[in-house]
Amino acid sequence: WSSDVCSSDLFDKSRNLYGLNFARSSRKKEIILCEGYMDVISMHQAGFTNAVAALGTAFTSGHGTLLKRYTENVILSFDSDEAGQRAILRAIPILKEEGLTVRVLDLTPYKDPDEFIKGLGAQALEERIRKAMSSFMFQVKVAAGRYDQDDPESKTQFQHEAAKLLAT
């Protein structure tokens, strides 16, 4: 079985989530959405059976609809690199459109859940999950990083962007 499998009439990658068969019967109130299936395997081995991932494809509205059937709360646990952060920013509006409450897990200084668990352990990850930031605060944090807060004009541009985020 490969994540490179194409979608067909019988199988649609944009409407399936790896690990959902376990996550939907988890006793947790939220589902943790990971970037890839290897992250899900690591999470499950560490006891986080509420972790899922898109199957080798970008996160879609079909995935959002599927998650909505099983939870009201999603925690995004994507890689802490730039690509992972961009993927989080793309996933947030899809999940919000479904009416889901979205929080973002901070894995720094580690790249992904597997490295985090190996470095600090499952208990430390549980604590990070408990303290996961709201999607709005994550978006504001990312936006703030794009502006020079010491420059008045740049700071004003950031404030306008933050106001737009608040209005959505």
What are these regions (language model features)?
Residues D4, D9-D12, D39, D79-D81, ...:
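Acidic-enriched, low-complexity/disordered segments with a strong bias for Aspartate over Glutamate
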